[in-house]
């Protein structure tokens, strides 16, 4: 047992018991929640209080009732108290979130004559967005070191020439805690900037470079993005006095969402003076409809900037958020350590423990499993918060894509964050991506923020982030460590297929000749009439302009109109469709073994009577006809859910020039049994093939050579290859039992050098492209040969 295993926990046994009782839903859902930097979890008593209050109280619009306004003002006072300040020093402007607070500063900060805008590279995307609307002389990006140098005595003495006053107001924005790595910026920097300016301007990004004053002719103001920091750390505005502080309360309490704040100091308030381009209700003394005259309120700062009606029902619930936090984690009566300081100690200890445990994970050849992304490690709580960012390495030193980690974690009931976390500057810094590589990633490869394009040329485009809250337990950390160890160190690494290990030229001549004479054939046809349900296997099947006839023509949606897939309900694989001359028959191969039949053909009157419904597949809108209450009740009964409906597509989507049914990407998905065989799973090969839910199954004799195809023919039908299929965690579901196992995903990633590609998407060539008559009925037939053009 390591020393860190024996650290004294921050919370007493009684406190931990009370905390656990507030988060019983985690155990009920078998969830391990490790994304507190995204949002923390709300205590169950918070939402219970909200329900009681909404049930019993009558809370009117604050523009109607002064009592509601007083209630909102109580929340303002509590916010100031929480951050150790008072109304004489700071004012609270409610916003939608921290991003909206940053926008407010960007819109209204008065840079004066020649003021500049400076921001730290490792900032949230919202800070980058400020650049689009500021009216500064120059915009500069500062590296973290250029700010931390202020603590080392490298100061600028502002001496005005001939006793003149400052010619501009410069604004410096940085995060109190980096939401990517958890690094904490020294808050002493705030006053040093305000008093002595910047020793380095940073890199000029836009505007005009100041070559004359070297920063001596500016007043400096600091905007502190405290959204990440304030969630798990004490922020004392009596000790550290930024001019602007941006907050999101859901990061502190989990509930309510949609409420943030901009705290403005008296000094900062003087600079929020740029003319408004818009005003809303509650912010003016008067306005004329017949003329442009209006006058803004000036009795208090927040009245000038809080447009319209505040989300007052959410704001009043903030009080219960403060109460819950202070009730569950009271100030330590023996040591005087405050609530938020105790939270800070708890999450830092967990982060340090996780780093210690992950450092011990190594492959047999000594290669560390984990690459960490932080500045100074986990030795000082004053410089590091409860966030651990990392990537997983392969045994050969390559990278495992973060999308795979997200899928494997999901299969283990662990919720964490992957990508760049809306902090592209930190992402570029930690992953050591130069500007040229950034262009490759975002402009040439087509990656966009939030997608799962995780490896490009073997290099990661993002990372994995784990973050903690006061309700996180040591057992949650252990579960993550065990998942990584089991998935990447303890599991059997699949061997390469012999055809790949031994080059073709090394085969005996007889086998070489035999291999050359063999042509791969279409072995199996699978049609999926109902999206995400079981396959209908056939030896021969007709084609339409959309692909295989009836393939993904029906879909099940929930009460919100969202498509139900096996990611949410694995029992869908137990619904076995079949089609006879006139009907679609659905059989549930579960407890009930019941079936239901639907007509394939409807009269015009029936079509007119059917309800029209809308949904989306891969962000493309689709429209369908509701198949009625009888089948809806059958689905509810067998799947154990409420409000399900069966839709039949009635309009065609368009992808490029090809029509699609309810498939995700292309008309057909093709899988090579040789590629499946190379995975070497212990289960029967047919079961593994079924996991990939392909329409066309071939066997080429060599794994993964289908990835080199650009076009192919099966019989007299010609196809072009759209590209490889990027797999998700649905392939981890056994299509015969509904059971999940992560081995499929992790094995594919290893074989594909960190990518999750398996199978290829193909599209039938149209008449324009291949002179084929799509109006003529064609069939695909098992046993037909496959020709690669």
From Swiss-Prot:
InterPro entries to which the protein is assigned, alphabetical: Aminotrans_V_dom, MoCF_Sase_C, MoCo_sulfurase, MOCOS_middle, PyrdxlP-dep_Trfase, PyrdxlP-dep_Trfase_major, PyrdxlP-dep_Trfase_small, Pyrv_Knase-like_insert_dom_sf
Keywords: Molybdenum cofactor biosynthesis, Phosphoprotein, Pyridoxal phosphate, Transferase
Disulphides: none
Role according to the record: Sulfurates the molybdenum cofactor. Sulfation of molybdenum is essential for xanthine dehydrogenase (XDH) and aldehyde oxidase (ADO) enzymes in which molybdenum cofactor is liganded by 1 oxygen and 1 sulfur atom in active form.
Keyword Transferase attached: yes
Uppermost EC category: transferase
Similarity comment text for this entry: Belongs to the class-V pyridoxal-phosphate-dependent aminotransferase family. MOCOS subfamily.
Name of the protein in its database record: Molybdenum cofactor sulfurase
Catalytic activity: Mo-molybdopterin + L-cysteine + AH2 = thio-Mo-molybdopterin + L-alanine + A + H2O
Post-translational modification N6-(pyridoxal phosphate)lysine, affected residues: 251
Requisite cofactors: pyridoxal 5'-phosphate
UniProt keyword Transferase, yes or no: yes
Residues recorded as bearing Phosphoserine in the entry: 741
Span of domain MOSC: 628-789
């Amino acid at each position: 047992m390591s020393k860190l295993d024996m650290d004294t926990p921050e919370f007493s046994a009684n406190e931990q018991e009370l905390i656990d009782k507030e988060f019983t839903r985690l155990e009920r859902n078998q969830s391990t929640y490790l994304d507190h930097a995204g949002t923390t979890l709300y205590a169950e008593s918070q939402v219970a209080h909200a329900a009681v209050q909404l049930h019993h109280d009558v809370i009117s619009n604050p523009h109607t009732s002064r009592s509601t306004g007083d209630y909102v003002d109580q929340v303002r006072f509590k916010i100031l108290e929480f951050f150790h300040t008072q109304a004489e020093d700071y004012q609270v402007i409610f916003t939608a979130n921290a991003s909206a607070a940053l926008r407010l500063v960007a819109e209204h900060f008065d840079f004066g004559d020649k003021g500049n805008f400076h921001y730290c590279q490792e900032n949230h995307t919202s800070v980058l967005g400020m650049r689009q609307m500021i009216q500064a002389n120059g915009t500069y990006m500062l590296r973290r070191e250029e700010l931390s140098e202020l603590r080392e005595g490298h100061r600028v003495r502002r001496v005005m020439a001939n006793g003149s006053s400052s010619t501009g107001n410069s604004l410096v924005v940085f995060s109190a805690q980096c939401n990517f790595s958890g690094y904490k910026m020294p808050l002493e920097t705030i006053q040093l900037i305000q008093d002595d300016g910047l020793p380095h301007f940073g890199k000029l990004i836009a505007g005009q470079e100041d070559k004359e004053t070297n920063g001596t002719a500016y007043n400096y103001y600091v905007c502190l993005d405290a959204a990440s920091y304030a969630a798990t750390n004490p922020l004392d505005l009596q000790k550290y006095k930024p001019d602007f502080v941006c907050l999101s309360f859901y990061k502190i309490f989990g509930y309510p969402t949609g409420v943030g704040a901009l705290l403005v100091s008296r000094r900062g308030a003087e600079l929020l003076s740029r003319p408004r381009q818009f005003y809303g209700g509650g912010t003016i003394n008067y306005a004329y409809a017949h003329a442009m005259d209006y006058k803004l309120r000036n009795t208090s700062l927040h009245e000038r900037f809080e447009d319209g009606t505040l989300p007052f029902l959410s704001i009043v619930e903030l009080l219960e958020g403060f109460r819950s936090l202070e009730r569950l984690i009271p100030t330590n009566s023996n040591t005087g350590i405050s609530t938020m300081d105790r939270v800070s100690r708890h999450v830092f200890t967990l982060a340090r423990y996780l780093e210690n445990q992950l450092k011990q994970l190594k492959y047999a050849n000594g290669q560390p499993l984990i690459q960490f992304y932080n500045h100074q490690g986990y030795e000082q709580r004053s410089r590091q918060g409860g966030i651990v960012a990392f990537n997983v390495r392969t045994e050969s030193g390559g990278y495992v894509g973060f999308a795979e980690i997200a899928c494997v974690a999901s299969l283990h009931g662990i919720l964490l964050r992957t990508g760049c976390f809306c902090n592209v500057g930190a992402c570029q810094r930690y992953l050591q991506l130069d500007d040229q590589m950034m262009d490759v990633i975002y402009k040439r490869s087509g990656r966009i923020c939030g997608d799962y394009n995780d490896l490009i040329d073997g290099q990661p485009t993002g990372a994995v982030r784990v973050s903690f809250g006061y309700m996180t337990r040591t057992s949650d950390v252990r579960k993550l460590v065990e998942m990584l160890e089991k998935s990447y160190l303890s599991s059997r690494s699949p061997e390469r297929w012999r055809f790949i290990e031994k080059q073709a030229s090394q085969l005996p001549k007889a086998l070489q000749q035999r291999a050359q004479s063999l042509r791969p054939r279409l072995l199996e046809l699978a049609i999926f009439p109902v999206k995400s349900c079981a396959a209908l296997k056939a030896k021969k099947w007709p084609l339409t302009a959309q692909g295989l006839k009836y393939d993904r023509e029906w879909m099940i949606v929930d009460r919100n109109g969202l498509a139900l897939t096996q990611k949410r309900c694995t029992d869908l694989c137990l619904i076995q469709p079949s089609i006879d001359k006139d009907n679609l028959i659905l059989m549930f191969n579960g407890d009930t073994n019941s079936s239901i039949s639907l007509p394939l053909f409807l009269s015009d009157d029936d079509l007119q009577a059917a309800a029209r419904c809308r949904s989306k597949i891969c962000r493309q809108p689709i429209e369908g006809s509701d198949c009625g209450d009888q089948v809806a009740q059958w689905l509810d009964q067998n799947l154990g859910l409420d409000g399900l409906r069966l839709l039949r597509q009635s309009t065609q989507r368009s992808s490029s020039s090809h029509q699609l049914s309810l498939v995700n990407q292309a008309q057909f998905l093709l899988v090579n049994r040789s590629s499946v065989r190379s995975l070497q799973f212990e289960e029967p090969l047919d079961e593994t093939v079924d996991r990939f839910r392909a329409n066309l199954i071939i066997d080429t004799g060599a794994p993964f050579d289908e990835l080199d195809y650009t076009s192919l023919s099966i019989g007299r039908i010609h196809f072009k290859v759209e590209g490889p299929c990027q797999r998700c965690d649905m392939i981890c579901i056994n299509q015969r039992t509904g059971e999940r196992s992560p081995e499929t995903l992790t094995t594919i990633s290893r074989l594909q050098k960190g990518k999750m590609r398996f199978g290829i998407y193909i599209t039938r060539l149209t008449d324009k492209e291949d002179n084929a008559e799509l109006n003529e009925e064609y069939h695909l037939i098992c046993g037909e040969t496959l020709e690669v053009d």
